[in-house]
Amino acid sequence: MSSKRVTWLSLTWVLVFLCLSVELEAQLQVGFYRTSCGLAEFIVKDEVRKGFIRDSGVAPGLVRMHFHDCFVRGCDGSVLIDSTPSNTAEKDSPANNPSLRGFEVIDSAKARLEAVCKGVVSCADIVAFAARDSVEITGGLGYDVPAGRRDGRISLASEASTNLPPPTFTVDQLTQFFSNKGLTQDEMVTLSGAHTIGRSHCSSFSNRLYNFNGTSGQDPTLDPQYAASLKTQCPQGSTNTNLVVPMNPSSPSITDVGYYVDVLRNRGLFTSDQTLLTDTTTATQVRQNAGNPFLWKNKFASAMVKMGQLGVLIGEAGQIRANCRVINS
């Protein structure tokens, strides 16, 4: 091999190494606030704990908040921004209002962090930390959260409607939707397991009870006994928009594989839950998750980390909001 070729190859490897180094430096990092705000993750965890004691529903709310944040414009905290007279923000989209909850936990954590580390910890990172802590406090596995996200300046209700999968989606639609976000079909099935905690408003699934596919009947794939119970809790023609039911009646506050067990019993609450059995591959994944709790919890933690890195703002992009509800002036 000639000396010129050796030199060329050496330079090529140097350039590759430098490019990789720059890319790695630009990514999120575990322990990002270790020196700039060492108590950051502890403070968020403490606020999640206090919120959970007041209302256990806060935990599933915060997990869902992280998902809804990341799928719209990336994980930039835009779901936290309040609407103004001139703009309807994400949180007031029908996909989020009135179902999203846990905002007060984020507010409390941010207020404490601003008191000890002014202008350091982003709202987007607080949401990511709070989601992790919510998984852990409900019995899931804790996991390291790479941080360093910056906060976005734009929040549009219209974007929430087009970037969040509705509860009526089929397995093919879900697979494509998650693929568009860079997530695999297996990760879609894994993250769907978040429905093992929390609640749903009756309006999100009432079509399965009273008007399935434009008929006057109920969804034939829905377990009859479960359907009867749901009809009791969600009477036909009710004008009460606050009626809710647990996603997983047997253990609504525990992060376990109850969701997958329910789906196998034809007790998935949403069409988008039960549809997982209509595809050979996803049905196999449902059965595997139902029978391997520890495996699913590990997969769920990994999928949450990956989801938490969607479309993030880093470096000098975005801002660090002083108030998570308001864009800095």
UniProtKB/Swiss-Prot annotation:
Keywords: Calcium, Disulfide bond, Glycoprotein, Heme, Hydrogen peroxide, Iron, Metal-binding, Oxidoreductase, Peroxidase, Pyrrolidone carboxylic acid, Secreted, Signal. The active site is at residue 68. It catalyses: 2 a phenolic donor + H2O2 = 2 a phenolic radical donor + 2 H2O. The record marks 64 as: Transition state stabilizer. Its EC number is 1.11.1.7. Pfam families: peroxidase. This is Peroxidase 5. It comes from Vitis vinifera.
